[in-house]
Regions:
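Short, surface-exposed alpha-helical segments at coil->helix boundaries
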Residues: 61, 103, 107, 186-194
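Primarily recognizes the serine-hydrolase "nucleophile elbow" in alpha/beta-hydrolase
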Residues: 122-170
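A domain-start/cap signature at the N-terminus of enzymes
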Residues: 1-46, 55, 191-195, 204, ...
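Cap/lid segment of the alpha/beta-hydrolase catalytic domain
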Residues: 79-101
Length: 235
């Protein structure tokens, strides 16, 4: 597998946002947020942000400092399908349907990040927003051995095909965060997802928020608490 070339500024990593590429098989963007006081000897949890329909990698990675400025290495990826422009005039993207190239892109991006930074192999979390939540679910349930958990924010499980690899998926932790006024993915869908995953034996937690399909600030705080609770349980 070809090795991704990183800019020289990453040789001595400092807090901030960085951009590189993943060859999967062409150059796809990989955006990275490094925490304050990044310590190369500490194995950081990795949070992988997957944007919603009409979003972008650049847009969603802005949320990383609001999740935590210290606790995580964060990356964000870009859906391969252009879907016009956002209200701010910047390009908008979508993940599209079931695409093995997208899966390869995400998995390669994680491996590239692990080669460059000190990431804990059992603390890799997928955080999907709206459409990106469906991709996060799909990856987490197909490859439960690769991930510590999946956070679905205002999204839903993919329908129309088997996903649960019992009993393997029972090791996967899931956090569902959903707006009570979400008309795009109704709250009833999230509740049905919760029941399905709980019945399958997964450690699933659900929170609701006074919002529609947009991200509520408390969602990010709950993701931080959810991940840190798990880390504290392991200590």
């Amino acid at each position: 597998m070809p090795r991704t070339e990183f800019p020289a500024c990453l040789i001595r990593p400092r807090e901030g946002f960085y951009t590189s590429e993943v060859q999967a098989p062409v150059g796809w963007p990989l955006r990275t947020f490094l925490p304050t006081g990044y310590e190369p000897n500490y194995p950081y949890p990795l949070v992988v942000f997957l944007h919603g329909h009409g979003g972008s990698d650049e847009q969603v990675l802005r949320l990383a400092p609001r999740l935590s400025r210290r606790n995580y290495v964060c990356i964000s990826l870009r859906g391969p399908h252009a879907v016009g422009v956002r209200p701010d005039g910047r390009p908008a993207f979508s993940w599209g349907g079931d695409d093995s190239q997208v899966e390869d892109y995400v998995l390669r991006a994680i491996e590239d990040t692990r080669r460059r930074y000190h990431v804990h192999s059992e603390r890799i979390y997928l955080a999907g927003f709206r459409e990106g939540a469906g991709l996060a679910y799909r990856l987490g349930l197909l490859y439960p051995e690769r991930f510590g958990g999946v956070a679905s924010l205002n999204g839903a499980l993919p329908r129309g095909g088997p996903l649960l690899r019992l009993p393997d998926v029972r090791r996967l932790r899931v956090l569902i965060g959903h707006g009570i006024a979400n008309a795009v993915a109704p709250l009833s869908l999230a509740r049905a997802d919760f029941r399905l995953l709980y019945t399958a034996g997964l450690a699933v937690r659900m929170r609701t928020y006074p919002t529609n399909h947009r991200i509520h600030p408390e969602m990010l705080r709950d993701i931080d608490r959810w991940i840190m609770d798990r880390i504290n349980e392991e200590v």
